[in-house]
Amino acid sequence: TKPYFEGPRQYVKQPPAEDCPVFNRHNHCPALVNCPNGDLLAIWYTCRTEPGRELGIVASRLPYGEDQWQVASDFWDAPDRNDHASALWVDEKGTLYHFNGLSAAATWGSLATIMRTSKDNGTTWSQARLIMSEHGLHHMPIESVLRTREGAILVPCDAVPGSAGGSVVLVSRDNGQTWTDPAEGQPIPDFSAGSTGASIAGIHAGFVQLADGRLMAFGRGNNIDGRMPMSVSDNLGETWTYSGSPFPPIGGNQRL
């Protein structure tokens, strides 16, 4: 085999206004999934201003075997609500999951989280439902959903609307039927080396399950000793222990 180099390929392609009225000037916060049929599906929010009620979600697809992304189209847009922000995940049986924040009105401070599923590579979707009944903090999904070896689905969400204050994990142990938030009602931790708390250090967290079963997460903000913060949990996100990572911190316009 030979090395293959290509790109970058633009996936944000502006559609005609009559085909996609929600499309606007500011496009941000993508989620990406490899569909069972080999297609790549990307979604992101589009808006005039990030706090605006006009903010909605659009999608583009790179069909398997093709080298160009399709023009953007409507994906999710609750009328007169700020839809901030999105995550995609595919399970072991090929079912796609879409998680999204749903504001009570404008801004991303007070959100509920919706979930819907697709069994045909994202062509059609189930009716959306709230996975937890109340609006509030801890409901802006981050694009690093995973299923643990124990079978739990974990959806990370920003814990705060600001640039520092951590991330939390919504947990389902029954394949998405019911959900809990281990950090609900808990104070924002002291994100210093050696401390523990109910949240991940840093917003927009990315995380994995290690070979020994622990969860390891990195975040943006809440830097520790001048480094990107690292959080480790040995109880599926119930509590986290903090330390500085080997990596330099990241800031605005950067994500894990």
Label the model's feature ranges:
Residues 1-256:
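Asp-box/BNR beta-propeller blade signature and adjacent active/binding-site loops
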